[in-house]
A protein has these predicted regions:
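Low-complexity, acidic/polar, glycine-enriched regions of mature
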Residues: 18-221
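Sec-dependent bacterial lipoprotein signal peptides
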Residues: 1-16
């Protein structure tokens, strides 16, 4: 019996070691926070020019892809990002490292009730609740050149959690951009294969890497 338990423990350690998400800041997740209506100049999200990249890790490898944005707005007060929100088209989920039938099969699998259940939850949303300057003296970040720390409510598959992560925010003329690279624990939003306690889910890393590249232009109206 001891040999069996030892073998199981060793196998578990091997599985975990092969499921490491890309090195990035780990976004802290807390309960949903109240949003405030920021006042200032509105900037319309450039859905065509913005992307959210993702990397999922499993035993033996990784897959990567993208989500597209539907719409959204950033609000700037005195030239600084103060608030905003954007909608994510979850049904746009694409797998970029596969082609042909393998690509279609994995995309269908991820969009099904096994994970994102896009037929019931086709849209995710991120609402900014706080933006503060990044203090390199008291904080560290794997994102080189981080300028701000952003917090916001992320609603995914009907679950809302507040996440905090470093970002690079740039305001240039009539445009603004926000770039971030961080990992989240997918189980906080109920994303698990056949349930969190199913052995099939153990082969998939809980942490998913997200790469945000969101652009917006000053609204003309």
């Amino acid at each position: 019996m001891k040999k069996i338990l030892f073998a199981f423990s060793a196998a578990t350690l091997i599985m975990v070691s092969c499921q490491t998400a890309p090195e990035a800041d780990k976004a802290t997740a807390t309960e949903q926070q109240e949003t405030t209506n920021a006042t200032g100049d509105n900037y319309t999200i450039d859905a065509a020019g913005s992307t959210i990249g993702w990397v999922g890790t499993k035993t033996g490898g990784q897959h990567n892809g993208t989500f597209l944005l539907s719409d959204g707005t950033f609000t700037l007060a005195d030239g600084n990002l103060a608030g905003g929100s954007f909608n994510i088209d979850v049904s746009s989920l694409a797998v970029n490292d596969l082609t042909g039938d393998d690509k279609a099969k994995l995309e269908g699998h991820l969009k099904s009730g096994d994970f994102f259940q896009v037929d019931s939850f086709p849209t995710a949303k991120f609402e900014i609740t706080s933006v503060v300057p990044f203090d390199a003296a008291t904080n560290t970040s794997k994102l080189e050149g981080a300028t701000h720390t952003i917090s916001g409510n992320l609603t995914l598959r009907g679950e809302t959690k507040n996440v905090t992560f470093p970002a690079i925010v740039k305001v240039e003329g009539t445009s603004v951009s926000a770039v971030a690279d961080f990992n989240i624990d997918r189980t906080n939003w109920g994303l698990s294969y056949k349930g969190p306690n199913n052995p099939a889910d153990w082969f998939i890393a809980k942490e998913v890497n997200l790469k945000l590249d969101v652009k917006a232009a000053k609204s003309t109206m």
